[in-house]
Amino acid sequence: MDYFDSITNDHVFPKSWYLRSAPKNIEKWQVPSCAQCNNIYSKLEEELLTHLALCLNTKNNDEKNIQRNILRSITPEYGKNAKDVNSRTKKRKKLLADISFFKEIPSYGILPNFGPTTKIVLPEYRTIRISPINLEKFGEKLTKGFTYIFYNLLINKTDEIQVIIHENRNINFVKELFQKFAYKHNNLGNSIIIERIKTEDNTEINILYYFNIWQKLQFYSYVKKMK
């Protein structure tokens, strides 16, 4: 948390990440944000969404819609003016630079739930690099934003945040913990499901989160805040 002379509002969960099937009357949470942070996160979220969208299942109408919007955003022919055409061209070039080809499916490093959707052996497999730093920063943003929304608490620089991208291995005890004690928010359709657990004593507050986006991108986060 820092002090700024002026602030804006930022959507905790990005507007462009909501599925078309999301209920129309849901509250799309916003929190105070400085303009600089808002701009930084907007670029980060756009880059993440652009990369993730190419890995979605086009047989699912919701996922297909996200992918179609992203492909349109990097297609120069849809540019409204010269500046827009140039921007789309740069985005497309940057995206293509992050695509690699493999003869066999890599045995490690694949984001859970974003691997091949068919067991058919292909001549080659296209992969796209997802920045682990961007994923972690995005997880931190959700954690900070929802901590403010649900608990009216601000995360300071001295507080600890950890974001954990799991691979469904050795986390049974964590799953059991959430099954027993978590408060669950699932009124946003499949856009995002949020589960949270809060504990505190005389010296610190501990909050655990589980985020499930599109029933695909799943991760946990942990906040340790000193009183």
Located regions from the model:
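Hydrophobic/aromatic-lined pockets within catalytic cores
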Residues: 17, 38-42, 147
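Short Cys/His-centered divalent metal-binding micro-motifs
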Residues: 30-51
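Extended, surface-exposed interaction regions
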Residues: 48-68, 94-97
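Short Fe-S-cluster ligation motifs
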Residues: 26-36, 63-78
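Short flanking/linker segments adjacent to small metal-binding domains or redox-active Cys/His motifs
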Residues: 71-114
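Histidine-centered nuclease catalytic patch
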Residues: 1-30, 46-47
